[in-house]
């Protein structure tokens, strides 16, 4: 104690590190933890409350969605069951059997069902069919109701009477104002399942709701045969709401109707004597604080609309649980703050000792190094903190001191070795310069001969070992260059010979092509003349074809005229026959008139004086009849003559008609022949024109070929000149080995002749 008392009179900034670091760490930790604890205390209640509100809202939404899913699934199950063919058949059979049962038997069976829950109708001849089908429905629907947690499954016929139930409901007519009859009436005009609202539950009995859906006739789809009713208990709602999990042990979720009455039981408010009612402010959607039962609660409400019903899904958390959660959070924060301060103090003490101890050791080591002790051992170089960095820095100082002493010794030894090496290198450099001079002289001589075009002087002097690859490469390059020049010379001579032959052949080709062009030009002129003659022939044939067509048309017209004349003569002949008939009638009339006049004269002579006048008239009539008869004979004779002449004319016209038809047939044959001649002449003219065009194109192509042959000949001459120039250049080189680069004699020119 006595050693540390003077620190009370010293500024904390001048305290040793072993005291300064723990003191500063504790102060910072206490200040930070106090600030955090204060802020956490202020915000913990609000944060906890916000989390609980969000969780309650999530619970309300989850419960709403779960209940909606359950209601939809139940609706689909009810509708699917109502459309089941097996149920339709059993329902129809049960309805038929129910109609045959007497009211007395139904009453007795209903009493037993209400008391014992069992259907005990005796199977008589009139009830057997109903009982059998009832038992079949029992075997199917009771397990289904238990599996789906239904309170009961009921079947009502078209008159609204219950014909089957899985529970204790009696069979027979129902109360007109009861829930079953209301459910049947609500589904009367709907194709879907209709649900009634849940009745509020009590502690002694759960509430009920009914799903009702029409059952159609099995043979008449548009006819309603009855109703399927599914009874659901509020126990289903309790099971769904029981899944809600809040923050506290007393949190829960419940369902309330628009009338404020709960549809599920609550653990917060249980009053069997008084009817529980939910405050109206809890029914509206949102998060709020209100009273429920005898407690103040935090609630979140969500609205659920299902068919015609409006419900509120309310998640509740007692306010006491909310406050207790905030208090527990604050206590945890204070405990964490205190533990943090204590831990910070312990860590500060350990940190200060871990720093002050190694620092004292480093100070001692640095003092020894300053006194020239380079064999000192540096501790702490393996540490990964700042003390390790400082230890490694001191180690560097020690190593530098050791290296400085060793460097002084090495410098003296290196200076002596460098002097010896310098003298040896001077001697080797002088010898290498002499060898390089000899090698460069040989290579220079070879390159000088190469520049003069001499390729037959390789290097034969021996080179030192390191320069022998240079000699080998030079001699190999010289040999390859010599062989290349020889090959080029041979190829140039061969190319000159080939070009000469091509030039001669091209010259002959040009002359032949020129001769062909002259011949083709004459052929073109001849074809022009032939084409003109054929065109004239075609035109003449076309004119003849037109004339023959006119003659054919005239012959056809003459034939028509002759036909008309024959028809006219036939009409004249017919008219003559009719006139002859009329003349015969006139002769008959004249003969009869003459007989009448004769009879009249006889009668007049018998009459005496009184008939004289009548006798005169009869005489005149007889004379007139005689003249008519004579005239009729003359006309008949004339008609006979005319008929004979018409017959003769008709024969002549027929002969002329046959002759004209023969002429027309010959003219038609001539027309066809002339048309064929004209078509053939036209086709020949067209083909000659095309052939003339082809000949002209051949002539043009031949002229182009002649021009190309002249160009090829000029190119061959130019190439031959280049080959000669190349041979002259190659002759400047001396290849050695008896080879000569003089231009070889050209082979005899080979003439190429083209067959005509």
From Swiss-Prot:
Residues 736-756 are annotated as: Disordered. It holds the Pfam family HAMP. Residues 491-720 form the Methyl-accepting transducer domain. This is Probable chemoreceptor y4sI. The lineage of its organism: Bacteria, Pseudomonadati, Pseudomonadota, Alphaproteobacteria, Hyphomicrobiales. Chemotactic-signal transducers respond to changes in the concentration of attractants and repellents in the environment, transduce a signal from the outside to the inside of the cell, and facilitate sensory adaptation through the variation of the level of methylation. Attractants increase the level of methylation while repellents decrease the level of methylation. One of its GO terms (biological process) is chemotaxis. Residues 353-406, 434-486 form the HAMP domain. The keyword Cell membrane applies. InterPro entries: Chemotax_Me-accpt_rcpt, HAMP_dom, MCP_chemotaxis, MCPsignal_dom. It is found in: Cell membrane. PROSITE patterns: CHEMOTAXIS_TRANSDUC_2, HAMP, PROKAR_LIPOPROTEIN. It comes from Sinorhizobium fredii (strain NBRC 101917 / NGR234). GO terms for molecular function: transmembrane signaling receptor activity. Signal peptide: none annotated. The chain crosses the membrane at residues 26-46, 330-350. Keywords: Cell membrane, Chemotaxis, Membrane, Methylation, Plasmid, Repeat, Transducer, Transmembrane, Transmembrane helix.
């Amino acid at each position: 104690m006595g050693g540390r008392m003077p620190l009370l009179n010293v500024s904390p900034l001048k305290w040793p590190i072993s005291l300064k670091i723990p003191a500063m760490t504790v102060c910072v930790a206490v200040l930070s933890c106090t600030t955090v604890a204060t802020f956490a205390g202020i915000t913990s209640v609000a944060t906890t409350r916000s989390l609980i509100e969000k969780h309650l809202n999530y619970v309300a939404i989850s419960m709403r969605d779960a209940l909606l899913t359950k209601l939809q699934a139940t609706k689909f199950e009810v509708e699917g069951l109502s459309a089941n063919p097996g149920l339709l058949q059993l329902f129809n059979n049960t309805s038929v059997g129910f109609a045959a049962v007497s009211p007395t038997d139904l009453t007795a069976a209903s009493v037993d069902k209400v008391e014992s829950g069992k259907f005990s109708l005796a199977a008589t001849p009139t009830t057997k069919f109903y009982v059998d089908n009832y038992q079949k429905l029992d075997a199917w629907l009771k397990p289904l109701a238990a599996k789906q947690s239904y309170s009961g499954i009921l079947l009502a016929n078209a008159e609204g009477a219950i014909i089957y139930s899985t529970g204790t409901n009696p069979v027979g007519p129902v109360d007109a104002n009861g829930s079953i009859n209301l459910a049947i009436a609500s589904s009367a005009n709907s194709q879907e399942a209709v649900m009634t609202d849940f009745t509020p539950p009590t502690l002694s009995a759960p509430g009920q709701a009914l799903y009702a859906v029409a059952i159609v006739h099995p043979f008449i789809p548009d006819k309603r045969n009855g109703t399927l009713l599914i009874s659901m208990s509020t126990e289903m709602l309790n099971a769904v709401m029981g899944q809600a999990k809040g923050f506290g042990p007393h949190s829960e979720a419940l369902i309330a109707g628009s009338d404020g009455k709960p549809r599920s039981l609550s653990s917060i408010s249980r009053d069997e004597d008084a009817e529980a009612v939910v405050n109206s402010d809890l029914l509206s959607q949102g998060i709020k604080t209100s009273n429920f039962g005898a407690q103040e609660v935090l609630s979140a409400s969500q609205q659920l609309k299902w068919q015609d019903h409006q419900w509120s899904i309310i998640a509740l958390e007692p306010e006491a649980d909310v406050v207790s959660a905030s208090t527990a959070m604050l206590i945890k924060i204070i405990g964490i703050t205190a533990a943090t301060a204590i831990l910070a103090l312990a860590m500060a003490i350990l940190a200060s000792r871990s720093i002050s101890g190694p620092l004292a050791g480093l100070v001692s080591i640095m003092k020894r190094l300053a006194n020239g002790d380079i064999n000192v051992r540096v501790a702490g170089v393996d540490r990964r903190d700042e003390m390790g960095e400082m230890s490694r820095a001191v180690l560097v100082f020690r190593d530098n001191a050791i290296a400085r002493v060793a460097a002084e010794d090495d410098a003296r030894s290196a200076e002596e070795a460098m002097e010896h090496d310098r003298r040896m290198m001077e001697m080797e450099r002088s010898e290498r310069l002499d060898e390089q001079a000899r090698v460069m002289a040989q290579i220079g001589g070879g390159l000088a001969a190469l520049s003069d075009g001499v390729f037959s002087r390789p290097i034969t002097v021996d080179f030192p070992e390191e320069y022998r690859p240079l000699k080998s490469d030079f001699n190999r390059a010289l040999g390859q260059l010599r062989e290349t020049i020889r090959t080029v010379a041979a190829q140039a001579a061969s190319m000159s010979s080939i070009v000469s032959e091509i030039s001669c052949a091209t010259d002959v080709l040009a002359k032949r092509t020129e001769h062909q062009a002259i011949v083709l030009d004459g052929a073109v002129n001849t074809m022009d003349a032939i084409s003109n003659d054929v065109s004239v022939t075609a035109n003449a044939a076309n004119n003849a074809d037109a004339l023959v067509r006119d003659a054919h048309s005239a012959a056809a017209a003459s034939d028509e005229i002759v036909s008309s004349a024959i028809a006219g003569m036939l009409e004249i002949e017919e008219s003559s026959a009719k006139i002859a008939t009329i003349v015969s009638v006139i002769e008959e009339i004249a003969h009869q008139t003459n007989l009448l006049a004769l009879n009249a004269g006889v009668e007049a002579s018998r009459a005496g004086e009184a008939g004289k006048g009548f006798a005169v008239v009869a005489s005149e009539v007889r004379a007139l009849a005689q003249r008519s008869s004579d005239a009729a004979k003359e006309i008949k004779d004339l008609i006979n003559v005319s008929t004979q002449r018409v017959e003769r004319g008709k024969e002549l016209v027929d002969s002329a008609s046959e002759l004209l038809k023969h002429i027309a047939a010959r003219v038609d044959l001539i027309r066809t022949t002339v048309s064929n001649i004209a078509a053939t002449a036209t086709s020949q003219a067209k083909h000659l024109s095309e052939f003339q065009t082809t000949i002209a194109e051949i002539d043009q192509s031949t002229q182009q070929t002649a021009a190309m042959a002249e160009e090829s000949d000029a190119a061959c001459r130019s190439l031959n000149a280049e080959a000669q120039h190349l041979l002259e250049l190659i002759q400047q080189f001396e290849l050695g080995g008896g080879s000569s680069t003089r231009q070889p004699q050209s082979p005899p020119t080979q003439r190429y002749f083209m067959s005509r």
